[in-house]
């Protein structure tokens, strides 16, 4: 799933979805006001788990898609077709003497490029072909140069470049529509091509982007991480020129001069597993056990400084997400395979934030065959959602939810704020935030809610709506830690209590008082938070609640038995205690 912005108007957002049937079939679709199918120029590889490793990135109104196919190329939706980025290098041209009765002499060097034009504006250009060396026989007036077979990548014209020096400057001497396959060259050797030609661009300026695994955008350039095809590039960070740089099709090419890539320790620590950013001006790149920070330098010949931040922490693929901390400062969340949830704060410090759920984390199946994790940050609720596979599951079956506003920084890392969600919506192979009016065929709302694509059936769920989980009832509950008012050497009794909840019509809970780690439990059913006269908070007395000989007390709040009719919020529980004789 991906939310694509084809314009600067966010109400024009499109929802893109890829559905797969095992290893046999796939459907790539986009929704504007209706759903339509998109046919990629290169079919997705549906074996080896690659069908679950597709990622997208919006830039300049285009949707760049990183996926494995038979071609080692990045792909892009340009509004009309899903094609390969850039244009491949064509083959070398051929040439022959033509125009009898002349005296054209001197060895020439020819090469061709393919270009796409819109009117007179060049949109894309290929690298030059290999060079053809041709020596005219001296008895003809011209040389007829014939273009090679087309690359079939959307070129509208081809360019002929010529030089009198194999290793010298080349000049564009013709730009011709692809339907015309020949160009006649009658330039005298003594005149040369610099007089009437246009200096050609350098070799290495229009390298097509290979099949990267992960994509980011830094201001107006595309950043490509890893590779589906080449193990030597699995730890590579590469980037396109800035959009207003000289040249054309800048978001669809890689330059070799200046060098526009860096290899992050190559094989050490394995392949790149993803990246996030920029966050506070920094791009964060992860391997399974390494973390790197890249910072823009402003220097064209060395665009990024990259340093290793940690070689003992790393991230599971799909688990990295930008969010905010409890203070509202931008930060990065990720799942380290060993210790689970972690956070990189605004000061660049890596902190563990999953100690409170480490028992649950130990059930996560890092060897899941298809998908280990998916993640998103739900801004409206200040929540980080991770969908993970547990035990023997090969796809996510549990959702870990961190309520960031409830977290606290401690000497043990970031603590508190955790909830564990199961049910149908936890089984997500794909997630994104999208407009809450996705079902309406109107301009898209700017209120974005989590949408999940399930692991069974061609179903996309819009979450954070209603009081069930796609028709399945569930029980929401929260349990506090045990509290000891004095010490565990002293007992006390409970004679009465009260609970404070947000006023909501039809909202009710069952409240349990737990003595000494489960030694005894009293449950008060149907605590109702319906308002009586417009109050915003409801205080409900807890009558007939008597319990003695407690050393600790804990509380459990759960959906009232019989089903959920409204959402509830418990804000405070108070007990009146009766001291007893301590032991």
Identify the function of each model-found stretch.
Residues 269-297, 301, 312-340:
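Beta-propeller domains
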Residues 1-38, 43-61, 117, 138-140, ...:
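Beta-sheet repeat architectures centered on beta-propellers
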Residues 1-41, 74, 86, 115-125, ...:
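N-terminal beta-propeller domains
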Residues 81-82, 300-306:
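A short alpha->loop->secondary-structure connector
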Residues 22-25, 69-71, 79, 280-281, ...:
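Surface-exposed loop/turn positions within WD40 beta-propeller blades
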Residues 72, 121, 169, 231, ...:
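Flexible, glycine-rich phosphate/dinucleotide-binding loops
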Residues 35-233, 245-261, 582:
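Disordered, low-complexity "stalk" and linker segments at domain junctions of extracellular
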Residues 175, 308-312:
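Flexible gly/pro/ser-rich segments immediately N-terminal to CXXCH heme-c attachment motifs
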């Amino acid at each position: 799933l991906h939310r694509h912005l084809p314009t600067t108007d966010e109400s024009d957002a499109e929802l893109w979805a890829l559905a797969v049937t095992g290893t046999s079939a796939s459907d790539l679709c986009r929704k504007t006001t209706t759903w339509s199918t998109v046919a990629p120029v290169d079919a997705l590889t549906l074996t080896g788990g690659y069908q679950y490793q597709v990622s997208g990135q919006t830039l300049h109104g285009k949707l760049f898609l990183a996926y494995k196919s038979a071609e080692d190329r990045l792909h892009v939706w340009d509004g009309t077709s899903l094609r390969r980025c850039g244009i491949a290098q064509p083959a070398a041209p051929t040439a022959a003497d033509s125009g009898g009765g002349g005296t054209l002499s001197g060895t020439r060097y020819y090469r061709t490029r393919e270009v796409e034009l819109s009117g007179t504006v060049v949109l894309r250009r290929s690298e030059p072909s290999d060079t053809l060396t041709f020596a005219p026989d001296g008895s003809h007036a011209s040389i007829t140069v014939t273009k090679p077979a087309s690359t079939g990548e959307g070129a509208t014209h081809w360019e002929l470049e010529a030089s009198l020096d194999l290793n010298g400057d080349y000049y564009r001497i013709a730009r011709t529509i692809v339907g015309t396959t020949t160009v006649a060259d009658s330039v005298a050797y003594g005149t040369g091509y610099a007089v009437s030609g246009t200096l050609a661009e350098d070799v290495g300026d229009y390298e097509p982007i290979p099949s990267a695994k992960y994509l980011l955008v830094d201001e107006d350039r595309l950043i490509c991480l890893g590779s589906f095809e080449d193990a030597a590039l699995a730890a590579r960070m590469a980037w396109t020129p800035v959009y207003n740089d000289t040249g054309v099709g800048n978001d669809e090419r890689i330059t070799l001069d200046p060098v526009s890539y860096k290899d992050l320790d190559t094989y050490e620590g394995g392949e790149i597993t993803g990246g996030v950013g920029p966050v506070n001006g920094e791009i964060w790149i992860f391997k399974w056990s390494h973390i790197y920070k890249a910072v823009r330098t402003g220097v064209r010949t060395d665009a990024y400084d990259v340093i290793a931040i940690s070689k003992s922490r790393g991230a599971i693929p799909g688990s990295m997400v930008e969010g905010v901390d409890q203070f509202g400062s931008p930060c990065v969340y990720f799942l380290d395979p060993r210790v689970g949830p972690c956070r990189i704060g605004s000061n660049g410090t890596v902190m563990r934030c999953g100690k409170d759920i480490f028992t649950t984390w130990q059930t996560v199946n890092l060897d899941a065959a298809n998908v280990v994790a998916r993640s998103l940050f739900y801004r409206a609720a200040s929540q980080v959602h991770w969908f993970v596979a547990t035990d023997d599951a090969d796809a996510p079956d549990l959702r870990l939810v961190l309520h960031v506003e409830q977290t606290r920084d401690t000497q043990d890392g970031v603590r508190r704020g955790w909830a564990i969600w199961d049910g149908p919506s936890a089984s997500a192979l794909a997630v994104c935030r999208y407009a809450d009016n996705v079902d309406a065929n109107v301009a898209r709302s700017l209120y974005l809610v989590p949408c999940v694509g399930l692991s069974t059936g061609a179903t996309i769920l819009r979450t954070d709506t209603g009081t069930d989980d796609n028709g399945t009832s569930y029980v929401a509950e929260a349990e506090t830690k045990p509290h000891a008012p004095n010490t565990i050497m002293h007992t006390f009794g409970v004679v009465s209590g009260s609970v404070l909840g947000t006023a909501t019509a039809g909202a009710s809970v069952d409240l349990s008082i737990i003595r000494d780690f489960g030694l005894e439990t009293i449950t008060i059913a149907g605590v109702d938070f319906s308002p009586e006269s417009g109050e915003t908070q409801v205080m409900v007395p807890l009558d007939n609640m008597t319990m003695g000989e407690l050393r600790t007390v804990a509380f459990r709040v759960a959906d009232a038995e019989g089903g959920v009719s409204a959402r509830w919020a418990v804000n405070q529980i108070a007990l009146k205690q009766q001291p007893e004789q301590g032991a």
